[in-house]
Amino acid sequence: MTIDTAAWPAGRVNSLGFAKPPHETRVVAAMSGGVDSSVVAAMLKAEGYDVIGITLQLYDHGAAIEKKGACCAGQDIHDARNVSDAIGIPHYVLDYESRFREQVMEDFADTYLSGSTPIPCIRCNQTVKFADLLATAKELGADCLATGHYIRRTDGPEGPELHRAQDASRDQSYFLFATTRAQLDFLRFPLGSLPKSEVRELAEKFALQVAAKPDSQDICFVPDGSYAKVVEKLRPGSGRGGEIVHLDGRVLGKHEGVIHYTIGQRRGLGVATGDPLFVVKIDAPARRVIVGPREALMTRGLLLEELNWLGQGSLEEAATHGARVLIRVRSTRPPVPGRLGYEDGVPAVFFDAPEEGVARGQAAVLYDLEGSTRILGGGFIARPLPADERVVAA
């Protein structure tokens, strides 16, 4: 069903926040070929917007055609094109393989080699989707770029704000903390207030061929879940072995490369001591994997880098005054209370109670402590601050 836009009252704001009728509002819909982005395009078209669909070809098109659960490659490009044809909008495919490899895949490999644990989906949003694609949308004369992310954007007193999705089980705020205010001004997230079940129903209502398509899973360019294989392919010779060392200094065994390990890992260590051991630190330059008891995983705080602040006032003011925040260190964990501050002049967050198994390279996302859904920003973890001094000295 379409909306009659023939008579549009002066000053009336459309569903995307513009004071003009939908047919005068150009929207670029980022289409990955999945259900969510397809529903966004169909919804906007049904409301009468001037919609253009764009899909980014991000990696090895040929090898990815048969891969299930990927995005932005192979069959997904065909699906996005077919959906666009079905709903009657123009569709374009932009080849961003080189850009994606340079900004996302190369960074992924180098981050693992440094002993950190990367989050390529954040890098992709930050350096490709919300940078290059957004710029392309503006070049096409679009008023905004709409995506299928489960997150909400609202207009606040200091500009656009980012809020958690209505459906907590689908909330993607952890992966979108790096979105800047300038980007938020141009972005729209039509699914932020909808549960996934309703999105599936809409896909069926619009008779989209992707209505029953599974959600994308894992990292799109890691076909079998083996991160180490991808790193080895991008950085031949990266699997150089070294020692597995206990916190007390004992050498317990050998490993085949730090790229096979992450903080908090217990399985696959290949050492037997009778007591449960976990990876508590990775010394990449020395090629040492340091293990210890579970209590050695506890972290009192985190030094942050590339910090993006979306809260009130400036980051400097918030950190200087020790602003109280909620901190999320993994997408699967609930946020925990703490405060902003500085450690040795570097922006940091400090937990009210020590947090377990926090890895360098992951994200620390900040939320409003006062029960609201607002995302205050976040940063990448430059260095955890261990509660156990043995880990500091190791």
UniProtKB/Swiss-Prot annotation:
The keyword RNA-binding applies. SUPFAM superfamilies: Adenine nucleotide alpha hydrolases-like. Its EC number is 2.8.1.13. Disulfide bonds join C124-C220. It is found in: Cytoplasm. Its main location: cytoplasm. Keywords: ATP-binding, Cytoplasm, Disulfide bond, Nucleotide-binding, RNA-binding, Transferase, tRNA processing, tRNA-binding. The active site is at C124 (nucleophile), C220 (cysteine persulfide intermediate). ATP binds at A30, M31, S32, G33, G34, V35, D36, S37, L56, G148. GO terms for biological process: tRNA wobble position uridine thiolation. InterPro entries: MnmA-like, MnmA-like_C, MnmA-like_central, MnmA-like_central_sf, Rossmann-like_a/b/a_fold. The keyword RNA-binding applies. Residues 170-172 are annotated as: Interaction with tRNA. The record marks H149, Q362 as: Interaction with tRNA. It catalyses: S-sulfanyl-L-cysteinyl-[protein] + uridine(34) in tRNA + AH2 + ATP = 2-thiouridine(34) in tRNA + L-cysteinyl-[protein] + A + AMP + diphosphate + H(+). GO terms for cellular component: cytoplasm. GO terms for molecular function: ATP binding; tRNA binding; tRNA-uridine 2-sulfurtransferase activity. It comes from the Bacteria. NCBIfam families: PRK00143.1 (NF001138), trmU (TIGR00420). PANTHER family: MITOCHONDRIAL TRNA-SPECIFIC 2-THIOURIDYLASE 1, TRNA 5-METHYLAMINOMETHYL-2-THIOURIDYLATE -METHYLTRANSFERASE. Belongs to the MnmA/TRMU family. Catalyzes the 2-thiolation of uridine at the wobble position (U34) of tRNA, leading to the formation of s(2)U34. This is tRNA-specific 2-thiouridylase MnmA.
